[in-house]
Structures are given as structure tokens and as C-alpha cells.
């Protein structure tokens, strides 16, 4: 059995099998004892709006708050799930130019994306006393129907597209 936390239960109901249990708030759970694993990919989309001070707070809190709530549920569980897969992003590395980076890289920059991800991961790691924690550092979504590529296609279709930056930068994508 799967349980999905969603802001839009009615929309999710149209897209998911009937056997999936839908909840709209973590307050509907008192522990995580019935689950084998928890996957947390929640968060305000980062490419939909300008990164104003207010929007940065929305982006940050949408990730940090739910992750903190999940850590509290792990803490309250007598038989917690075996693994907690929590979202993060390659933004944690910042722009490192030609430097190759991996999960052991520790010279994190002091910019919004890096600080957002570093704190998000730190909150998730608070569950490490109760379960195995894995932070999934995803990249930019390149899909014609969603993510960054969907946003970039229209200008190109109108003949207005061109190189992004100098064209020499690295870009990890999914």
C-alpha cells in the first residue's frame, strides 16, 4: 500500500490507482510505523516565480517545514521505516566552474540554492538516529512537458532562443 501526501487530493485521485491512500496533511499520521520507506520530494517549484525575498522564504519553508515534520514522525515511531529518502538538489554545489564535484565535495558556496539545500539535508539527517537517511541531489528537469525545458522551448520555437550563458558551463539534468 502507498500513501501519498498531496496538496491536491482530487487531482491526485485522477492520476493514481484507487489503492493509493491520499492525505493532505501530515497531521493525519501519528507515527510512520506502518511504512517501509518514506520518500520526501515536497517543495515549492523553484522555476515558476522570481526569487524575491518572499518567494525564497516560501521555497525554503516548503522544504524545511515538511522535512522537520517527517523527522518528528520518525522520532515518534516505535518501528520507523527502514529508509528516509529526502529531496535535495545539485544547487548545493553552486557554480564550481571546471571543478568536478561529487557527494564528498565540501566547499559549499554561500548562495541561496546552496544554503537552501544544505539546511534541507541537515534537517533530514536529524532522522539518522531512527533510520537510514538518503539525500537525493536531483538536477534540472529537462522534459518537453515539464520543468526547465518546457519553459525554454517557447522562445526557441518563436526564433528567440539562443545560447544560455557562454555555453561552457556544466549542467546536470534528469
Model-derived regions, located:
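Catalytic helix-loop patch of NAD(P)-dependent Rossmann-fold dehydrogenases
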Residues: 61, 65, 97-135
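Conserved Rossmann-fold NAD(P)-dependent oxidoreductase catalytic core, especially the SDR/UDP-sugar
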Residues: 67-111
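SDR active-site strand-loop-helix element
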Residues: 5, 41-42, 84-90, 136-138
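Short, polar loop motifs at secondary-structure junctions
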Residues: 5-12
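NAD(P)H-binding glycine-rich loop region in Rossmannoid oxidoreductase-like domains
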Residues: 11, 19-69
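Conserved catalytic-core motifs of eukaryotic protein kinase domains, centered on the activation segment
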Residues: 15, 48-54, 95-98, 167
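N-terminal Rossmann NAD(P)H-binding glycine-rich loop of SDR-like oxidoreductase domains
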Residues: 1
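NAD(P)-dependent short-chain dehydrogenase/reductase
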Residues: 118, 128, 132-135, 139-172
Amino acid at each position: 500500500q502507498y500513501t501519498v501526501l498531496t496538496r491536491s487530493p482530487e487531482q491526485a485521485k485522477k492520476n493514481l490507482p484507487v489503492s493509493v491512500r491520499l492525505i493532505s496533511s501530515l497531521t493525519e499520521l501519528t507515527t510512520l510505523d506502518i511504512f517501509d520507506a518514506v520518500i520526501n520530494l515536497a517543495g515549492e517549484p523553484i522555476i515558476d516565480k522570481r526569487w524575491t525575498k518572499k518567494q525564497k522564504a516560501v521555497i525554503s519553508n516548503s522544504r524545511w517545514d515538511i522535512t522537520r515534520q517527517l523527522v518528528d514522525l520518525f522520532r515518534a515511531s516505535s518501528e520507523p521505516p527502514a529508509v528516509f529518502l529526502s529531496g535535495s538538489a545539485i544547487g548545493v554545489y553552486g557554480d564550481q566552474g571546471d571543478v568536478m564535484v561529487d557527494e564528498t565535495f565540501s566547499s559549499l558556496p554561500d548562495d541561496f540554492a546552496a544554503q537552501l539545500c544544505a539546511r534541507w539535508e541537515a534537517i533530514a539527517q536529524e532522522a539518522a538516529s531512527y533510520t537510514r537517511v538518503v539525500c537525493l541531489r536531483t538536477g534540472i528537469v529537462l522534459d518537453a512537458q515539464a520543468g526547465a525545458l518546457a519553459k525554454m522551448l517557447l522562445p526557441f520555437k518563436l526564433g528567440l532562443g539562443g545560447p544560455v550563458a557562454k555555453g561552457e558551463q556544466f549542467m546536470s539534468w534528469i
